Amino acid sequence: MSVGTPLGDGEEVSFSRDYFVEMDVRSEEAYELASEWFDEVVFTKKLVLDGPPDWGELKDELRFLRERYEKVALLLVTNRPGLIKEVKKRNLRALLYVQGGDMRVNRLAIENGVDALISPWLGRKDPGFDHTLAGMAARRGVAIGFSLAPLLSAGPYERVQILRFMTKTWQLVDKYGVPRFITSSAETRWEVRGPGDLMSLGRNIGMDAPRARASLNFYPRRLLKKV
């Protein structure tokens, strides 16, 4: 079953209840396994930056990855918020994700209109996401990535804290209509999870079944229209 969901300006994305997208896997082995469970998979190149990269080399690598995987994202991991704008203004022909955690990075990622901010609560003692950022993310079309990976490596107490922060973030995302997706962010095949497990994560942080499904279908597919 599929229906057309209006996006504004007459644009529609077909919503199929049985079509699922994994937006963030970070190795070939993870990609291969995820491709068995999902209809579309985005391969993510993780880029840790303390300063500007070799732009030519980065473009060449992304070109190779597009040829191999077709749908590619660049995950920027940095403590220097100014680098977000530098990367954003380059024509890299890939989705741009920013790893959340540092509050300055969270804010600058949203202000600069990146495609997605992944786990803004990572390593924090609070969600790293508030009403101001939620409103800005909604206006600028910045998706929030709800990643399973940190939960897999966390101890019991930390896992409870992460789930609490994810729940608070989800409440703001839902209230302000922020784009979102649920992802494994798998770096190995052992971290890959299927659509059912990811929807269960959504339910655990307060999503109802339709919203959890839309976080693996409608919102990811809308984001993929950018590439």
Tell what function each PLM region has.
Residues M1-F43, L49-E67, G82-K85, N91-L95, ...:
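Charged catalytic cores and adjacent phosphate/nucleic-acid-binding surfaces used
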Residues K71-I84, D102:
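A glycine-rich, hydrophobic loop/mini-helix early in the fold
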Residues Q99:
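N-terminal glycine-rich "phosphate-gripper" loop used for MgATP/nucleotide binding
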